[in-house]
Amino acid sequence: MRRELLLEKIETYKAIMPWYVLDYYQSQLAVPYRFTTLYEYLKEYKRFFDWLMDADLTQAPKIADIDLSTLEHLTKKDLEAFVLYLRERPSLNTYSTKEGLSQTTINRTLSALSSLYKYLTEEVENDQGEPYFYRNVMKKVSTKKKKETLASRAENIKQKLFLGDETLAFLDYVDKEYEQKLSNRAKSSFRKNKERDLAIIALLLASGVRLSEAVNLDLKDVNLNMMIIEVIRKGGKRDSVNVAGFAKGYLESYLAVRQRRYKAEKQDLAFFLTEYRGVPNRMDASSIEKMVGKYSEDFKIRVTPHKLRHTLATRLYDATKSQVLVSHQLGHSSTQVTDLYTHIVNDEQKNALDNL
């Protein structure tokens, strides 16, 4: 989502929230939380407060009037009823056959509520230096996590990775073959954005940065001489990320057309731009997800930008056998999350042996 639109949506949610949620929001800006995270949390709070009113657990006529005592005196049974509601409510997605929300979505909702409750019961200080209240009912609510071994997860993921020669083959396909299947009208749109789209895909495959990190790149953050980019990692930390050399040509080709094709002026700082009616804007995450999905589906299998991150990590581990190096490249503080790539590479080695 474009930053300007994201901030606009955040303000819309803030306008209907109780004062203590606004306090929480302001506090989290200092952490700092990403605006995308805060936006998702505000959406979850609206979902929760709407349910409180529908379930007659508050007499407030509107969300902004729900007082602190309502949250303070909610019971474990109340929260379990909310979880049951989420699990069984009709899906808003008309294309889905599921009756309720996924466990992943439910966990995200509970995570947002846990963060709010922790703030209200531990972090905030009133005039007497005490939290608003002490009883944190969220500590009594358990979340159900998907059980899956690393080996099982590796098996599921590796089918959606572009390993070995497929990394460059994917880029080559978008560059030289994709448009052959398009109508003349579709070709015109494809050619306008071809260099940009290739640059985005190449950067994701060559650096392993997160989608949000690619979206938030500015021109000043990209050093093609050193093949290093500066990104803001989770938690607000700046990091320098090395980029594999095969991406350089694609990035240079995009920069050669960026100003002219997207009507970019000096004040347009975003690295990846889109243009509508002569106005350039930062390309948003949703557009990049759709773009990657479209090209990858035509090439082999529909994947997300995060699978391109997994692709880079797996290839890097295969080349170096260093979990430390991979974790640094991905911006992780621990090597634990890179265990997945050892399983994928070990499976690939086993398959190679079986073919001898």
UniProtKB/Swiss-Prot annotation:
<dbReference type="InterPro" id="IPR010998">
    <property type="entry name" value="Integrase_recombinase_N"/>
</dbReference>
<dbReference type="GO" id="GO:0007059">
    <property type="term" value="P:chromosome segregation"/>
</dbReference>
<keyword id="KW-0229">DNA integration</keyword>
<feature type="domain" description="Tyr recombinase">
    <location>
        <begin position="169"/>
        <end position="354"/>
    </location>
</feature>
<dbReference type="InterPro" id="IPR002104">
    <property type="entry name" value="Integrase_catalytic"/>
</dbReference>
<dbReference type="InterPro" id="IPR023670">
    <property type="entry name" value="Recomb_XerS"/>
</dbReference>
<dbReference type="InterPro" id="IPR004107">
    <property type="entry name" value="Integrase_SAM-like_N"/>
</dbReference>
<dbReference type="GO" id="GO:0009037">
    <property type="term" value="F:tyrosine-based site-specific recombinase activity"/>
</dbReference>
<dbReference type="Pfam" id="PF00589">
    <property type="entry name" value="Phage_integrase"/>
</dbReference>
<feature type="active site" description="O-(3'-phospho-DNA)-tyrosine intermediate">
    <location>
        <position position="341"/>
    </location>
</feature>
<protein>
    <recommendedName>
        <fullName>Tyrosine recombinase XerS</fullName>
    </recommendedName>
</protein>
<dbReference type="InterPro" id="IPR013762">
    <property type="entry name" value="Integrase-like_cat_sf"/>
</dbReference>
<dbReference type="InterPro" id="IPR050090">
    <property type="entry name" value="Tyrosine_recombinase_XerCD"/>
</dbReference>
<feature type="active site">
    <location>
        <position position="210"/>
    </location>
</feature>
<dbReference type="GO" id="GO:0003677">
    <property type="term" value="F:DNA binding"/>
</dbReference>
<keyword id="KW-0238">DNA-binding</keyword>
<keyword id="KW-0963">Cytoplasm</keyword>
<keyword id="KW-0159">Chromosome partition</keyword>
<feature type="active site">
    <location>
        <position position="332"/>
    </location>
</feature>
<comment type="function">
    <text>Site-specific tyrosine recombinase, which acts by catalyzing the cutting and rejoining of the recombining DNA molecules. Essential to convert dimers of the bacterial chromosome into monomers to permit their segregation at cell division.</text>
</comment>
<feature type="active site">
    <location>
        <position position="309"/>
    </location>
</feature>
<keyword id="KW-0132">Cell division</keyword>
<keyword id="KW-0233">DNA recombination</keyword>
<feature type="domain" description="Core-binding (CB)">
    <location>
        <begin position="16"/>
        <end position="121"/>
    </location>
</feature>
<dbReference type="InterPro" id="IPR011010">
    <property type="entry name" value="DNA_brk_join_enz"/>
</dbReference>
<dbReference type="GO" id="GO:0051301">
    <property type="term" value="P:cell division"/>
</dbReference>
<dbReference type="InterPro" id="IPR044068">
    <property type="entry name" value="CB"/>
</dbReference>
<dbReference type="GO" id="GO:0005737">
    <property type="term" value="C:cytoplasm"/>
</dbReference>
<dbReference type="Pfam" id="PF02899">
    <property type="entry name" value="Phage_int_SAM_1"/>
</dbReference>
<keyword id="KW-0131">Cell cycle</keyword>
<dbReference type="GO" id="GO:0006310">
    <property type="term" value="P:DNA recombination"/>
</dbReference>
<comment type="similarity">
    <text>Belongs to the 'phage' integrase family. XerS subfamily.</text>
</comment>
<feature type="active site">
    <location>
        <position position="306"/>
    </location>
</feature>
<feature type="active site">
    <location>
        <position position="234"/>
    </location>
</feature>
